[in-house]
From Swiss-Prot:
Species per Swiss-Prot/TrEMBL record: Sarocladium schorii (Acremonium strictum (strain IMI 501407))
Reactions the enzyme catalyzes: (2E,6E)-farnesyl diphosphate = alpha-humulene + diphosphate
Induction: Expression is significantly up-regulated under xenovulene A producing condition.
Keywords associated with the record: Lyase, Magnesium
Higher taxonomy: Eukaryota, Fungi, Dikarya, Ascomycota, Pezizomycotina
Biotechnology remark: Xenovulene A is a natural product exhibiting little structural resemblance with classical benzodiazepines yet is able to displace high-affinity ligand binding to the benzodiazepine site of the gamma-aminobutyrate A (GABAA) receptor and could be potentially used as an anti-depressant with reduced addictive properties.
Presence of keyword Lyase: yes
Descriptive protein name: Alpha-humulene synthase asR6
């Protein structure tokens, strides 16, 4: 049965969507912060003395941790400093957004515009294909695999990637006018249900995505918003983490990689460690982008202003997030997830393209084959029929069975399980 929660109603206005997520998430530690709400106050995180003995916790063995005292060894790092707390001003940001939505039209002239910053991007569906490449790359760096039973979870990551590169109207996302590689948002929610994700987990991931789509759209639609955030690292970080939706992606990643014998992992039971990991990933992503010279000038640049001081503060947050995660119940997943930015940024085409002058690298045949099955060609507009030509030339059409698993029909003949046809892409990473 498809998910039929009230929050899927396609008739809601943008303002009503905003109110829905305010009601769903509620306030965090700051009164009036919903939906930019956090239960963890990063400015209050305390660093525990390092005894040099980690036998009490295996968590230290996961992820990439660079201790505070060793940072001066790296020319791209240095010392740390506690950030001045601006978190309690988040209610001012919420009030500003409330007022903007009172006067904002439902549709803006720039809705649908490409915002990737890469001049060669001209077709939103081609941009979506690159976003799918990036989504799968993130997934494997987090520690996932490309097995077919996680197809819709990976499509979810694709939906989370695309609003950074295309200005998407929240209404069109919700009502199905907008399609990601031919898939509507309702398709994704129904697919998650077919994959066995529980209704509560789906609703949490759904609301996280709504929040991301809204905050991404707002940062592009409202020219007065980002100036209120820039130069205030803890305040900008709160907003920036929501625009990346690292929390919703983490919830589905944990669903995919948790040991079945331990049962499902719910945000309600693990909110503390999950929030810290979602913040940590954005911090390590920005640390790595700064090291490669591609952070400065981004819309949600957390170190804007006094960049040298803001970078000290960013490193301060990273060190404390990683140490706290060391002792958490799911450290084996969360420390890798939280520190993944340090290793995926220098490896992924998404960031290497920016280093190379904001160009695009060709999608090679091997990648094209992997990406082809994520395209719903029956629903692509005519002008996008030629995307991924190297994958399309294989004449392989993806089909779903009742369990959300992919089968392939090759040239109209035998149906093959993905695992039988492409064993090389089912290998777990990490």
């Amino acid at each position: 049965m498809p998910v039929t929660t009230p929050t899927k109603m396609a008739t809601l206005t943008t303002k009503q969507m905003w109110q829905t997520i305010k009601d769903y998430f509620g306030d965090g530690f700051v009164t009036g912060s919903a939906p930019i709400s956090y239960n963890v106050h990063t400015c209050d995180m305390q660093l525990q003395p390092d005894s040099g003995i980690h036998a009490a916790s295996d968590g230290i063995h996961y992820g990439v941790q660079i201790s505070e005292d060793s940072m001066p060894l790296f020319s791209i790092m240095g010392d740390t400093a506690a950030p001045p707390c601006t978190c309690h001003r988040v209610d001012e940001i919420v009030k500003h957004i409330d007022e903007f939505l009172e006067r904002a039209p439902e549709a803006l002239p720039d809705d649908g515009a490409i915002t990737s910053g890469k001049p060669c991007d001209t077709n939103p569906d081609q941009v979506s294909l690159y976003a799918m490449r990036d989504s799968l790359s993130w997934w494997v760096h987090w520690g996932g695999n490309l097995r077919p039973e996680h197809y819709w979870k990976q499509i979810y990551i694709g939906f989370a990637a695309i609003p950074d590169d295309v200005q998407i109207s929240p209404r069109e996302f919700l009502d199905g006018t907008y399609r990601y590689l031919g898939h509507t948002w309702d398709d994704c929610l129904s697919g998650l249900e077919e994959e066995g994700v529980s209704p509560d987990e789906i609703e949490f991931a759904n609301m996280c995505m709504w929040r991301q789509m809204l905050t991404q759209w707002l940062e592009k639609a409202d020219p007065e918003l980002l100036p209120l955030l820039k130069g205030k690292i803890s305040l900008m970080l709160q907003y920036r983490v929501l625009t990346a939706n690292t929390l919703g992606c983490l919830a589905l990643f944990m669903n995919a990689t948790a040991d079945p014998k331990d049962g499902p992992i719910h945000y309600a039971d693990s909110s503390y460690e999950m929030e810290i990991a979602s913040v940590a990933q954005c911090v390590t992503l920005d640390m790595a982008k700064e090291a490669m010279g591609i952070l400065q000038g981004e819309r949600t640049e957390v170190v804007a202003g006094d960049r040298a001081q803001r970078k000290r503060e960013l490193r301060w947050i990273y060190v404390r997030c990683m140490q706290i995660l060391e002792s958490q119940p799911h450290a084996h997943m969360l420390r890798r997830y939280g520190s993944a930015g340090l290793h995926y940024v220098p490896m992924m085409d998404r960031y290497l393209e920016r280093v190379s002058g904001h160009t695009r690298f060709p999608i090679r045949d091997g990648a094209a084959r992997i990406l082809e099955r994520f395209i719903n060609r029956a629903e692509l507009p005519k002008e996008s029929e030629d995307i991924n030509p190297n994958g399309r030339s294989l004449k392989v059409s993806a089909k779903m069975n009742g369990n959300g698993q992919l089968h392939h029909e090759v040239n109209g003949n035998a149906k093959l399980h993905l695992e039988a046809e492409r064993p090389d892409v089912t290998t777990a990473v990490g």
